[in-house]
């Protein structure tokens, strides 16, 4: 007698549950719910949003109506022939080049990047091919250049605290999985890959959120290049976003999550590395579109 009423209550609830369950399964099956969750996740992780950026040299449009987003902890490769607009674009993102129009948001806020200091203050660091190292200084002195640790002698005479700078440099290198045994050597005596590591470490000391790298593996041997690649991957594991300019598609496909192709100042396309081919990217660089499409 008790079972029948309970059963009668259960059947309507069951009948309501089945359609809802089927609706969920069908939507999930066709990717609608999954796609929305991905979009929401990406939206919440947008670190930088560039909208309709324009930069001209006289009558030449070096960057022509370019828009894209950078997500937290991703490696974003920027590729294209010489003169495509890559370097001009990243100079604008680092405050080294004024923009004619367009907008930039960083960490959810509109920003004006008029000078490199503006970029530095919000957590954007740049590594150019020149590296900007002082050859006569050792590793800690280069890492702390411009932000040296000081101590007081006799309570009032400032002096560089070389012990603390060396200690913190080693800790920083270890944090990012870097083995650099000759930290007391002048950087002029270091290899190309080691010098690259020192320059990157100087940026990491500032707790950057986005690092822009111009040809980071240029002129490096296989072993040296592998060390720099590993460091970049370790940076990503710490949720640091990275924009890499490179002509080496082998490195790009090893590193990047997404690839942006530029030609004649325009953004041709942005593709996921996992779902494209080197041939497709070469076609976009050469012809401005994938010839297979």
Label for each model-derived stretch:
Residues 35-293:
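Glycine-rich phosphate-binding loops of nucleotide-dependent enzymes
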Residues 3-20:
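Long, intrinsically disordered low-complexity tandem-repeat segments
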Residues 4, 11, 33-36, 264:
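N-terminal leader/targeting segments
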């Amino acid at each position: 007698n008790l079972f029948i009423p309970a059963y009668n209550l259960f059947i309507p609830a069951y009948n309501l549950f089945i359609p809802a369950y089927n609706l969920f399964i069908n939507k999930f099956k066709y990717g609608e719910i999954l796609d929305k969750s991905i979009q929401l996740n990406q939206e919440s992780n947008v670190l930088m949003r560039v909208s309709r950026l324009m930069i001209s040299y006289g009558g030449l449009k070096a960057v022509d109506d370019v828009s894209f987003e950078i997500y937290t902890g991703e490696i974003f490769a920027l590729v294209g022939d010489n003169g495509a607009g890559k370097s001009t674009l990243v100079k604008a993102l680092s405050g080294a080049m004024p923009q004619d129009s367009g907008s930039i948001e960083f960490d959810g806020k509109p920003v004006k990047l008029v000078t490199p200091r503006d970029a530095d203050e919000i957590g954007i660091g740049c590594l150019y091919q020149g590296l900007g190292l002082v050859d006569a200084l050792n590793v800690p002195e280069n890492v702390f250049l411009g932000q040296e640790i000081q101590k007081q002698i006799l309570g009032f005479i400032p002096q560089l605290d070389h012990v603390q700078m060396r200690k913190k440099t080693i800790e920083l290198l270890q944090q990012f999985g870097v083995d650099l045994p000759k930290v007391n050597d002048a950087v002029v005596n270091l290899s190309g890959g080691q010098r690259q590591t020192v320059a990157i470490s100087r940026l990491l000391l500032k707790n950057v959120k986005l690092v822009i790298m111009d040809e980071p593996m240029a002129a490096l041997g296989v072993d040296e290049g592998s060390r720099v690649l590993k460091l970049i991957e370790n940076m990503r594991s710490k949720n640091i976003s990275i924009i890499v300019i490179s002509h080496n598609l082998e490195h790009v496909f090893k590193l990047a999550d997404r690839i942006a192709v530029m030609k004649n100042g325009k953004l041709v396309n942005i593709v996921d590395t996992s779902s494209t081919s080197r041939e497709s990217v070469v076609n976009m660089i050469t012809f401005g579109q994938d010839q297979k499409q």
